[in-house]
Amino acid sequence: NTVYGNVTIAQYAMALLMNICHRIDVLSDMYREACDEHKNVMMGRNLPRQIRQIELYEKTIGIIGLGAIGLCMAKMAAGFGMKVIAYNHHKKTGPEYDFVEQVPLDELLGRADVISIHCPSTDETRGMIDKNVIAKMKDGVILINTARGDIIVEDDLVEALNSGKIYAAGLDVVCNEPITGRIPLMD
């Protein structure tokens, strides 16, 4: 929960996911640079990996942390036709959660095509996403974190990104903020 808007943060998390899936940043630059390249993209010719399109419809999103922000993200994902599963330390009850399948964390890790983190930084969650947890994730998973940077062990994330275990990560937080120099995660 935030002072400046639970919906705003969930929308930002969804925007990170949409940019990963549809490379809006790359395509926007390409459109500005060359009409011919735009035609090649639209015709599906020579589509490089960095602008590969990923369809979200019928994919499974796993939400870690089903508080106000996590619930907003779940609703948005459902609006895109995604199957929504979630893990929360304490099971959530009430009609607003009926569309969410609440599962144990290990099950979420093995089933989710996208994992979006929306839990607070606590003794239990600090360093929670490490190489052991990443190993339980589906190959090629997309990871979104708009919660707290210290929930993910950055060196383990870098290794998983480099190996392809994690296809891409959308982050607006890192372990040590503010960033004062180049960090391996940016490479």
Predicted regions located by residue number:
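Phosphate-binding beta-alpha-beta segment of Rossmann-like dinucleotide-binding domains, i.e.
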Residues: 2-60
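Residues at the starts of beta-strands that form the adenosine-phosphate
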Residues: 60, 74, 79-83
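Residue in the alpha/beta-hydrolase core beta-strand immediately N-terminal to the catalytic nucleophile
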Residues: 60-62, 142
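Glycine-rich Rossmann-fold phosphate-binding loop(s) that bind the pyrophosphate
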Residues: 66-67
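N-terminal Rossmann-fold NAD(P) dinucleotide-binding loop
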Residues: 70-71
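Conserved SAM-binding motif I beta-strand of class I
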Residues: 86
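Rossmann-like adenosine-cofactor binding region
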Residues: 89-184
